[in-house]
UniProtKB/Swiss-Prot annotation:
BP terms from Gene Ontology: ATP synthesis coupled electron transport; electron transport coupled proton transport
Taxonomy, superkingdom: Bacteria
Transmembrane segment boundaries: 6-26, 36-56, 87-107, 115-135, 136-156, 169-189, 209-229, 243-263, 274-294, 311-331, 332-352, 375-395, 418-438, 489-509
HAMAP family attached to this UniProt entry: NDH1_NuoM (MF_00491)
Protein function: NDH-1 shuttles electrons from NAD(P)H, via FMN and iron-sulfur (Fe-S) centers, to quinones in the respiratory chain. The immediate electron acceptor for the enzyme in this species is believed to be plastoquinone. Couples the redox reaction to proton translocation (for every two electrons transferred, four hydrogen ions are translocated across the cytoplasmic membrane), and thus conserves the redox energy in a proton gradient.
A single MF term (Gene Ontology): ubiquinone binding
Membrane topology: Multi-pass membrane protein
UniProt-recorded name of the protein: NAD(P)H-quinone oxidoreductase chain 4 2
UniProt organism field: Trichormus variabilis (strain ATCC 29413 / PCC 7937)
Length: 561
């Protein structure tokens, strides 16, 4: 029910969208007023989220809260239905936090600033809409609405191959989202009543064959967004060409839509099919971890290396979802939140580095840590978080996933051991490619007495208008020595404070969703028990779980032993 009779979630969704409509009316050609206006709207919406959840959300309840439902097209059962629970509420806060800081990170945008901030606010609303939609058709509309601003943000404000990267992103995600629409229609039309309400869809009984088809289709749709191998190839191109603020949202929020969809629809609505697909998810998770790590190490472009790092880290989300344990599913949720913060700050700092050096080629960098010590220190802290250093949020989330897989009583010990061992190999790769990136970019001997910039000799290395770092000295002539500004330090520090806070005291985050993840995992385990009784060969032959043994009847007492 609506708290105090006020539609809080609707207000949170519509505030950025309605505010974006006034941007063309602002008397501002250079964008100075527009950026302050957009930032103010973002802050106001985030404050509204915090107020709403602080006063009207009960973290001890696993049910949907702040429910709003208004009939939209009653003839087909379509309604404006929104709500939050332990799965969606933390992701709403993540979206608000990352998007607001990304608008602050875009302070230097001077190309079509009105259009840029208009698209950022529309994207803000679409992200929130995806996470709070309780109607599957509304979920699909919000999912599609998010594609348009991202496409334009990449294709207009991106790099040299921006149109290729934006088109690839659009084709992948739009084609995959067709499966959401098909699955939604199939579930809505099944049975006697036609409805798109997610709660009512979860109460329907689907034939197992239909569930398996629905699960497979949704896995493809969400797998593209989550960058699951082999559906991930759009991600490195998009990150490589997108501006830093857009990359912050891509890695910090949009990837998490895929993980959210898997938990919300695949696990909650199709638990029987999840029993059969869980080993596939676990295997894909391990492949993601290793494949992403190896490819990341092979990249010489800084943002492409970080993009493949995201592919690797999303493998832990799949492992946790497939673990059948409370701690594993909780770890998957924490990994999404943790990676959202870590990836956002790393892509932001990569953008800060690019603003100074005008290159993402790590081979052309080296020694810039001497000239930009603040950027170096912040980048090092973000890197330590990404490689799961104890005391950082990444360590807690990955540890919980490992514990979840190790303690799973559904799979056989052999399968658990293989999965944990292979995932551990991927964890070993992480410091290799991240620390080597730090070495290439920030360490080195510093500037030489003479260096070649744009094929021109610069003898005076004291000129602050010239940046000649490292041994190659192939930076553009417009590169500068300038260290991080107060604004840039504030943005990075805002992320790092949360990363360290969750790493030191994980309950800051886990208390928001643990009740819900336990409820979801309990539902899936109940489905496993029912299926195992009727099909004792499930996960048989020793590779997965042992065969279910029939209860033994005691001859004397007639009791079940």
């Amino acid at each position: 029910m609506m708290a105090d009779g006020f539609p809080w979630l609707t207000a949170i969704i519509l505030l950025p969208l309605v505010a974006s409509a006034f941007i063309p009316l602002l008397p501002d050609k250079e964008g100075k007023l527009v950026r302050w206006y957009a930032l103010g709207v973002g802050i106001a919406d985030f404050v509204l989220m915090c107020y709403t959840f602080w006063h009207h959300y009960d973290a001890s309840s696993a049910t949907f809260q702040l429910v709003e439902k208004y009939d939209w097209v009653p003839q087909i059962g379509f309604s404006w239905a929104v709500s939050v629970d332990g799965i969606s509420m933390p992701l709403v806060l993540l979206a608000g936090f990352v998007t607001t800081l990304s608008m602050l990170a875009a302070w230097q945008v001077n190309l079509k600033p009105r259009l840029f901030y208009f698209l950022m606010l529309v994207l803000y609303s679409a992200q929130i809409g995806v996470f709070v939609a309780q109607d599957l058709l509304l979920f699909f509309i919000m999912w599609e609405l998010e594609l348009v601003p991202v496409y334009l943000l990449v294709s207009i404000w991106g790099g040299q191959k921006r149109r290729y990267a934006a088109t690839k992103f659009l084709l992948y995600t739009a084609a995959a989202s067709i499966f959401i629409l098909i699955a939604g229609l199939a579930m809505a039309l099944h049975g006697d009543n036609t409805t798109f309400d997610i709660v009512e869809l979860g109460a329907k009984n689907y034939p197992l064959a239909l569930e398996l088809l629905l699960y497979a289709g949704l896995l493809i749709a969400f797998g593209v967004k989550l960058a699951i191998f082999p559906l991930h190839t759009w991600l490195p191109d998009a990150h490589g060409e997108a501006s830093a603020p857009v990359s912050m949202i891509l890695a910090g929020v949009l990837l998490k839509m895929g993980g959210y969809g898997l938990i919300r629809l695949n696990l909650e609505l199709l638990p029987d099919a999840h029993i059969y697909f869980a080993p596939v998810l676990a295997t894909l998770g391990v492949i993601n971890i290793i494949y992403g790590g190896l490819n990341s190490f092979a990249q010489t472009h800084m943002k492409r290396r970080l993009a493949y790092s995201s592919v690797s880290h999303m493998g832990f989300v799949l492992l946790g979802i497939a673990s059948f344990t409370d701690v594993g599913v909780s770890g998957a949720m924490l990994q999404m939140l943790s990676h959202g913060l870590i990836a956002a700050v790393l892509f932001f700092l990569a953008g800060v580095t690019y603003d100074r050096t005008h290159t993402m080629a790590m081979d052309n960098l080296g020694g810039i840590g001497q000239a930009m010590p603040k950027v170096f220190a912040l980048f090092t802290a973000g890197t330590m978080a990404s490689l799961a250093l104890p005391g950082m949020s990444g360590f807690v989330s990955e540890l919980k996933v490992f514990i979840g897989v190790t303690t799973s009583d559904i799979y056989s010990p052999t399968f658990c051991t293989v999965m944990v061992f292979l995932a551990a190999v991927g964890v070993i790769l992480t410091p290799i490619y991240l620390l080597s990136m730090l070495r290439q970019v920030f360490y080195g001997t510093g500037a030489e007495l003479s260096c070649n910039i744009n094929n021109g000799a610069y003898e005076n290395q004291e000129d602050e208008g010239t940046a000649c770092f490292g041994t190659d000295c192939l930076l553009p002539g417009e590169a500068v020595y300038r260290d991080a500004s107060i604004r840039e330090v504030f943005i990075a520090a805002s992320f790092l404070v949360l990363i360290i806070g969750v790493g030191v005291y994980p309950k800051i985050a886990t208390q928001l969703y643990d009740v819900k993840t336990v409820a979801v995992n309990t539902q899936v385990r109940q489905s496993y028990t029912q299926i195992a009784q009727s099909n004792p060969q499930i996960y048989a032959k020793g590779f997965f779980a042992p065969k279910i043994v029939e209860p033994e009847v005691m001859a004397v007492s007639g009791m079940i032993k």
